[in-house]
Regions:
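Conserved active-site alpha-helix within GNAT-family acetyltransferase domains
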Residues: 77-90, 167, 179, 191-208, ...
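Conserved acetyl-CoA-binding loop-helix of GNAT-fold acetyltransferases
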Residues: 54-58, 156, 162-179, 199
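C-terminal "cap" of GNAT-fold acetyltransferases
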Residues: 95-105, 188-191, 210-214
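Conserved GNAT acetyl-CoA-binding A-motif
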Residues: 64-74, 177-189
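Short secondary-structure junctions
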Residues: 20-35, 85-93, 116-117, 203-204
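A conserved beta-strand-loop-helix scaffold within acyl/acetyltransferase catalytic domains
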Residues: 119-157
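N-terminal charged segments
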Residues: 1-69, 73-79
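Acyltransferase donor/substrate-recognition loop-hinge adjacent to the catalytic core
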Residues: 85-126
C-alpha cells in the first residue's frame, strides 16, 4: 500500500535514487542536496512545498550556476512557477511528477520477434535493453533498496515508439524488482512517461518544477 505521507514518498525517492546511481546526498538549509554529478547537473537541491517565500530564498543556491538545480515538489506547483525569479535563474523543466505504486504481478507483454534483449548490472543498477539488430530500441533501469524499487532512465527511441516497448520494459523491470524483494516503487516521471505509468497503475503523488542557474 502506498504511503499517505508525501514527505515519506520524497524521502523514499531520494533514498532509492541515490542508491541506484551510487551517489550521495547532504543537506542545505534543512533540505536534501543530491550530488548528482551527471552531464545535466552537478547538484540538485530538493524541497517539499516550502512556501513561495522560502522557495525564492533558496534560489540563491543555484543563481548563476548552470550546474546547480533546485527542485520543488508539491501537490500544486502553480505558485512556484509564477514566483518571481532573480536574474541568473531559469526554469529547466516543469512537467515532471513524483509517482508511486504497489508492484503487482502483471503479465509481461510479448517481445516482438525481431527484438533481442540483454541485462547489464552495474553496482545497484540493473539495466534491461531491447535491441533491433545493432540499434537500441528501448532501455530502462531498476534499483532495489529493501522493499522499495525505483525505475530510472526508461526510454523508447523515437524510431521504435508506439509499439508497446515501454510497457514491456517496465513490466520486465517490475518482475525483476519483485524477484529481488521489492513490493513498492517510486520514481520521477516525465510527462510522456507519466502517461505510461498511469496506465500501469502508478499514482501521481506530487508535481515537480526544477530551476537551474544560468
Amino acid at each position: 500500500m502506498a504511503p499517505d505521507d508525501v514527505q515519506q514518498v520524497v524521502d523514499e525517492w531520494i533514498a532509492t535514487w541515490t542508491h541506484i546511481r551510487g551517489i550521495t546526498a547532504g543537506r542545505v538549509d534543512g533540505w536534501p542536496l543530491v550530488h548528482v554529478a551527471a552531464a545535466s547537473r552537478e547538484t540538485e537541491l530538493v524541497c517539499l512545498d516550502p512556501g513561495v517565500d522560502d522557495f525564492v530564498a533558496l534560489m540563491r543556491h543555484v543563481r548563476g550556476d548552470p550546474r546547480a538545480m533546485l527542485t520543488v515538489a508539491a501537490r500544486d506547483v502553480g505558485p512556484y512557477l509564477t514566483a518571481r525569479r532573480p536574474s541568473g535563474v531559469r526554469v529547466d523543466r516543469d512537467d515532471e511528477a513524483l509517482m508511486s505504486a504497489t508492484l503487482g504481478d502483471d503479465p509481461i507483454p510479448p517481445l516482438p520477434d525481431e527484438m533481442t534483449f540483454r541485462w547489464d548490472v552495474d553496482g545497484q543498477r540493473i539495466t534491461y535493453t531491447l535491441e533491433a539488430g545493432d540499434a537500441v530500441a528501448a532501455v530502462g533501469s531498476v534499483g532495489v533498496l529493501g522493499e522499495l524499487a525505483t525505475f530510472d532512465a526508461v526510454e523508447t527511441m523515437p524510431a521504435f515508439q508506439r509499439r508497446g516497448l515501454g510497457r514491456h520494459v517496465m513490466a520486465t523491470l517490475t518482475a525483476q524488482a519483485r524477484g529481488r524483494g521489492a513490493v513498492r516503487g517510486v520514481l520521477a516521471a516525465s510527462a510522456q512517461g507519466r502517461q505510461l505509468y498511469t496506465s500501469m497503475g502508478w499514482d501521481t503523488r506530487l508535481e515537480m518544477v526544477s530551476l537551474m542557474g544560468e
